[in-house]
């Protein structure tokens, strides 16, 4: 299986499908499943829980987290890659303990719903929002930023639900295993490196258009 084009991943996400995004070998060298938060389903959450096995998180813009009064988990981040975890949350209306796939999907969709208010969420909970760098992957080449950028490019709310992919033995899946996993489940694989190149191309194109205008 070959690495897919960024354009194909954008189209897949716009249709509500999941994709796998891989970062650089000299970074985490891991793959995350990404799906648009505004159309996430219980079935997609269950797939992440059963097959990917990582932590289900929601990559979000900082302004949305501020609007919901969801602060960073710690004031001083000492994690190696500075992943910006916030306080975990559960959506209260219409959910039970918050941990089921259905409850988690409700929480994710509520996080990106304009009608949600800070008091609608219990803290701590079972969904972990992540605060994305405001410059996206051009500011930080993480899965958090890739999820936000891809969903924005797909015309969705700029928030992606993400989950790391692990092997059956609990080790983290790398590119060879990720390609096998993707082929088995019919998912596209793209790289953050290609997403950075795609976005840099967009920036250059915008600059050229402004100069022509």
From Swiss-Prot:
Homodimer. Catalyzes the conversion of D-ribulose 5-phosphate to formate and 3,4-dihydroxy-2-butanone 4-phosphate. GO terms for cellular component: cytosol. Binds 2 divalent metal cations per subunit. Magnesium or manganese. HAMAP family: RibB. Pathway: Cofactor biosynthesis; riboflavin biosynthesis; 2-hydroxy-3-oxobutyl phosphate from D-ribulose 5-phosphate: step 1/1. GO terms for biological process: riboflavin biosynthetic process. GO terms for molecular function: 3,4-dihydroxy-2-butanone-4-phosphate synthase activity; magnesium ion binding; manganese ion binding. Mg(2+) 2 binds at residues 28, 143. Its cofactor is Mg(2+); Mn(2+). It is an enzyme of class 4 (lyase). Pfam families: DHBP_synthase (PF00926). This is 3,4-dihydroxy-2-butanone 4-phosphate synthase. Gene3D superfamilies: DHBP synthase. The keyword Signal does not apply. Mg(2+) 1 binds at residue 28. It catalyses: D-ribulose 5-phosphate = (2S)-2-hydroxy-3-oxobutyl phosphate + formate + H(+). The gene is ribB. The record marks 126, 164 as: Essential for catalytic activity. Its EC number is 4.1.99.12. Keywords: Lyase, Magnesium, Manganese, Metal-binding, Riboflavin biosynthesis. D-ribulose 5-phosphate binds at residues 27-28, 32, 140-144, 164. Belongs to the DHBP synthase family.
């Amino acid at each position: 299986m070959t690495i897919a084009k960024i354009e194909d991943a954008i189209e897949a996400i716009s249709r509500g499908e999941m994709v796998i995004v891989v970062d650089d070998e000299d970074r985490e060298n891991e793959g995350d499943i990404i799906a648009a938060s505004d159309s996430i389903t219980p079935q997609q959450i269950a797939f992440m829980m059963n097959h990917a096995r990582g932590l289900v998180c929601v990559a979000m813009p900082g302004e949305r987290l501020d609007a919901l009064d969801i602060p960073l988990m710690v004031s001083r981040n000492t994690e190696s890659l500075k992943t910006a975890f916030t306080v975990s949350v559960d959506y209260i209306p219409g959910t039970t303990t918050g941990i089921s796939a259905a409850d988690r999907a409700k929480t994710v969709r509520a996080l990106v719903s304009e009608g949600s208010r800070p008091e609608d969420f219990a803290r701590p909970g079972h969904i972990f929002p992540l605060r994305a760098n405001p410059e996206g992957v051009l500011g930080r080449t993480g899965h958090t930023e890739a999820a936000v950028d891809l969903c924005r490019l797909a015309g969705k709310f700029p928030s992606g639900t993400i989950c790391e992919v692990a092997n059956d033995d609990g080790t983290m899946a790398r590119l060879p295993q990720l390609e096998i996993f993707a082929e088995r489940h019919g998912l596209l694989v793209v790289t953050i490196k290609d997403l950075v190149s795609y976005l840099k191309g967009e920036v250059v194109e915008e600059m050229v258009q402004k100069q022509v205008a």
